[in-house]
């Protein structure tokens, strides 16, 4: 059996200018990064005769290895193309932290990949490096401001802007800077986040154009004065420099699938510690050019899909016409109590228990009023009895189920899912927001925790409650909420699998992100700088004297 990278290496790619031509984009509309990658110059002209349908792919709570949501996404896009629908896949860029850590890349798998997979999973077009440079330039400017006058009285103890790196590096979570004497700056305690957690990543993914990006950058709160008043980038006059560093990164990236379907891969916030959606500009561009735009939101529907619908959708101005919930037999069994070592065996009892996890995700999407289908991402170890149990469960809830064999067969293995999605997208949907945006941040957190997660109550730390009082005084109550929590559980405890009910959900702290336009609520012990596992993916990779890489997935 070939590995993902071996399959990708054997693929015959179409020159990117020909992929662009499929969308009506001529060579002046793109900036090529080699033969198979390009940036799309903005704005693009909409194609009025297209259907402009939006399909959101989400999933149940995953196992640590992930459940192939990106694989199903790509397979679905290729299947829609095989059915002669102009289709564009809109997805996030991978972070090199997980690529070299535990989860691996994010370009799909098997015969459902976006390519060139090696480039996309590594440095791609440099967007993450530009974001890292912009973020850290702002951090350096802040430290310089503290040292050279500090006219606004920014309190070094209350600077909340952190540096970032696109690596999993737990040693950088808490650091002290400015040591070494008076010429080395003002000593202060700070830390590093991973680049996808940066507010600049969220801003890049929510900005509607370069002017909006600059306006959002200017609204970033970097810290507070000695009088506890917020200080923004705009007050410091640093927004121009930061925006200059992002002027190319804001342009969406165009690549292709193994089936030669156009794919716009742009932006990469994580869904557990950020809002987990690709850029608004990428999705809008795809919608303007295609009959069907197939996009994804990170991790389970409790994280990525909720944030897509409550944070991204209002900016995008478009509600999904259909939702696909990806489930796997192994993840359902894992959520039902099976050990990771037993997931290759038939575990009908654990599978039945784990179906409660899927059922809650179904109910959550139905609460929004969206047409949906469940896609079973097929693994070779799945048995007919396991598949039937899932099908019977979903049919009892009025939801159709389709088995997708995207990894092994690409678009051809996902045709049934594509036909179901086309039928769903023609239905009339009546979207219902989860919460009132005029509600307080506390009320919004409680709504998400009780209605989406199944919590009985929310416990706020003393620090969080004090922050809520401050936010009310500052007029920040109308911002949406972005909860940072574990992806493995509906709770804030990653060991509580399945579909727990009536539990206490814990919020320890809030982080205002006015540039992005939301407030982050940190739940449990969620960290914004991941660490590496005992055996990182990095140690399984090799490169030979000719530059050929193995072990990348």
From Swiss-Prot:
EC number: 6.3.4.3
Top-level taxon of origin: Bacteria
Pfam families xrefs: FTHFS
GO terms of biological process kind: tetrahydrofolate interconversion
Gene3D superfamilies tied to this protein: Domain 2, N(10)-formyltetrahydrofolate synthetase, Formyltetrahydrofolate synthetase, domain 3, P-loop containing nucleotide triphosphate hydrolases
Segments passing through the bilayer: none
This protein's UniProt keywords: ATP-binding, Ligase, Nucleotide-binding, One-carbon metabolism
Keyword Iron-sulfur: no
Pathway(s) it belongs to: One-carbon metabolism; tetrahydrofolate interconversion
UniProt: ATP binding residues: 63-70
Gene (name only): fhs
GO molecular function, one term: formate-tetrahydrofolate ligase activity
Lineage: Bacteria, Bacillati, Bacillota, Bacilli, Lactobacillales
Family designation: Belongs to the formate--tetrahydrofolate ligase family.
Cited NCBIfam families: PRK13505.1
Name assigned to this protein: Formate--tetrahydrofolate ligase
Catalytic activity entry: (6S)-5,6,7,8-tetrahydrofolate + formate + ATP = (6R)-10-formyltetrahydrofolate + ADP + phosphate
């Amino acid at each position: 059996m070939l590995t993902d990278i071996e399959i990708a290496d054997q693929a015959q790619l179409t020159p990117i200018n020909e992929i662009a031509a499929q969308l009506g984009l001529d060579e002046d509309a793109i900036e090529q990064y080699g033969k198979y990658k390009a940036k799309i110059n903005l704005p693009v002209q909409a194609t009025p005769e297209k259907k402009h349908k939006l399909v959101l792919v989400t999933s149940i709570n995953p196992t640590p290895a992930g459940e192939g949501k990106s694989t199903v996404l790509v397979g679905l896009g290729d299947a829609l193309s095989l059915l002669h629908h102009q289709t564009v896949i809109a997805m996030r860029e991978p972070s090199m932290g997980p690529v070299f850590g535990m989860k691996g890349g994010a370009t799909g798998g098997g015969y459902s990949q976006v390519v060139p997979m090696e480039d996309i999973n590594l440095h791609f077009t440099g967007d993450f490096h530009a974001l890292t440079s912009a973020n850290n330039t702002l951090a350096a400017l802040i430290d310089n401001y503290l040292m050279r006058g500090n006219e606004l009285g920014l309190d070094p103890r209350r600077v909340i802007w952190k540096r970032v790196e696109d690596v999993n590096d737990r040693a950088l979570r808490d650091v002290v800077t400015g040591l070494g004497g008076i010429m080395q700056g003002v000593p202060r305690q700070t830390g590093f986040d991973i680049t996808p957690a940066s507010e600049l990543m969220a801003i890049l993914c929510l900005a509607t154009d370069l002017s909006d990006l600059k306006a959002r950058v200017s609204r970033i709160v970097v810290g507070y004065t000695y009088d506890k008043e917020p200080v923004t980038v705009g007050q410091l006059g640093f927004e121009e420099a930061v925006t200059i560093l992002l002027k190319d990164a804001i342009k969406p990236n165009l690549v292709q699938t193994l089936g030669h379907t156009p794919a716009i891969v742009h932006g990469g916030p994580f869904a557990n510690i950020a809002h987990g959606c690709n850029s608004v500009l990428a999705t809008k561009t795809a919608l303007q050019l295609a009959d069907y735009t197939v996009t994804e939101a990170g991790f389970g529907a409790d994280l990525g899909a909720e944030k897509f619908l409550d944070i991204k959708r209002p900016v995008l101005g478009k509600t999904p016409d259909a939702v696909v919930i990806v489930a796997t037999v192994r993840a359902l069994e894992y959520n039902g109590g099976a050990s990771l070592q037993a997931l290759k065996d038939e575990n009908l009892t654990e599978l039945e228990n784990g179906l409660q996890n899927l059922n809650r995700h179904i109910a959550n999407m139905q609460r929004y009023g969206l047409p949906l289908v469940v896609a079973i991402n097929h693994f070779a170890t799945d048995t007919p009895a396991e598949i039937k149990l899932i099908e019977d469960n979903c049919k009892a809830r009025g939801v159709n189920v389709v088995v997708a064999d995207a990894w092994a067969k690409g678009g051809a293995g996902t045709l049934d899912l594509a036909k179901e999605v086309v039928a769903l997208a023609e239905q009339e949907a009546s979207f219902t927001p989860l919460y009132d945006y005029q509600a307080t941040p506390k009320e919004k957190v409680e709504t998400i925790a009780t209605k989406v997660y199944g919590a009985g109550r929310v416990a706020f730390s003393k620090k969080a409650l004090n922050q809520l009082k401050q936010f009310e005084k500052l007029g920040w109550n109308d911002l949406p909420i972005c909860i940072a929590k574990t992806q493995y559980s509906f709770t804030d405890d990653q060991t509580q699998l399945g579909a727990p009910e009536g539990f206490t959900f814990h919020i320890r702290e809030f982080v205002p992100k006015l540039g992005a336009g939301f407030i982050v609520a940190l739940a449990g012990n969620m960290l914004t700088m991941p660490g590496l596992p005992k055996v990182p993916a990095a140690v399984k990779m090799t490169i030979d004297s000719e530059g050929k890489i193995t072990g990348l997935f």
